[in-house]
């Protein structure tokens, strides 16, 4: 049962900024050939857009696990999540960040959710995950834990 799902698509400004590859490639290739410049500009921009879309991770919460990108955390090993926005999110991604944490963060998405990992065998003390809906993600994890009848396992 899927309780939450979000794909971390790039923001519009990322696609606009990526479009700067067009004048850059035109500047390089127009002196050689206008056709080569135009074709190269289009191909490079299309490649950048395709890469941004293809590498957009999915955040998902089911009754059994939390998935962030390629990583999976059984719901029984997920601690009580904390949602952070604005300045607090910036601090979590910066000054308060533990180098051992599992990160699925995107620069174009400010809010984050910190999910403690209670598995003693896991080297990551917590996951830090970007999300546009931090309260909904945290609530979905709490609901999944409640539905599973699990309490946070401690190390």
PLM features per residue range, with description:
Residues 11, 33-34, 69, 85:
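Helix N-terminus capping/helix-initiation residues
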Residues 32-41:
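Short, aromatic-rich membrane-interface segments at the entry and exit
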Residues 40-41, 47-51, 94-96, 105:
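Short, solvent-exposed secondary-structure boundary motifs
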Residues 1-31, 151-155:
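N-terminal membrane-targeting/pre-transmembrane regions
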Residues 109-155:
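A membrane-cytosol interface segment of integral membrane proteins
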Residues 69-128:
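Non-transmembrane, membrane-adjacent beta-strand/coil modules in membrane-associated proteins
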Residues 43-84:
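Conserved beta-hairpin
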Residues 18-21, 42, 109:
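Core segments of transmembrane alpha-helices
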